[in-house]
Amino acid sequence: MNEVRAGQVGQIAILFERHHRALFRYFVSMHRDRELAEDLVQDVFFRMLRYRSSFDPAQSFVAWMYQIAHNASLDYVRKQRGTVVDIDEFTERRAELASSAPGPEEAAVRKEHLALLGRALDLLPEDKREILVLSRFQEMKYEEIAAVLRCEVATVKVRVYRAVRALEQLFQGLEKEKAS
């Protein structure tokens, strides 16, 4: 990014190659729309060029990039007002990759739990959903999340804890609802 900041804007292609997949997954998990995710990834790289002078080499590039992504996502949501954002497709894909080949009964139970988890994630407020996406699905460190969200690390820890608790409660409520 230092070269881009110094005026060698062609170097953005290297950054794109390194980071576009992670940004794409982030946006798909937030908006569940692959075409929109592609558009937002492009927007992030255009913003990186536009605001390249604001990058501080002493800080984390990844945190700066996700701060731009966070802002692009917020701008989109503000324009759309009322758009529901969820991450069940991403959750299902991640679980499939993480698991070994289960038997048919285990696969059915897992699929059912993933569907409930997706519904629970849909019901979470956007701020809680986003902090879970960043911490659990993008596997960002608390320090990086704090930079993205412009808050203290301790605040991030509390928000992650509260988001996980809220997700657990919603999931358990949906399980009870399904059982009755």
Label every PLM stretch briefly.
Residues 27, 78-81, 124, 129, ...:
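Short, Lys/Arg-enriched C-terminal cap helix and immediately downstream tail that follows
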Residues 50-57, 67-88, 102, 110:
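Arg/Lys-rich amphipathic alpha helix in sigma70-family domain 2
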Residues 2-25, 49:
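A short, charge-rich alpha-helical start-of-domain segment used by transcription regulators
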Residues 16-17, 24, 34-51:
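Conserved RNAP core-binding helix
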Residues 39-46, 59-71:
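Structural recognition of an alpha-helix C-terminal capping motif at a helix-to-coil junction
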Residues 5-6, 32, 43-60, 79-81:
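Sigma70-family region 2
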Residues 70, 74, 116, 120, ...:
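DNA-recognition helix of helix-turn-helix
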Residues 92-119:
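Acidic, proline/glycine-rich intrinsically disordered inter-domain spacer in sigma factors
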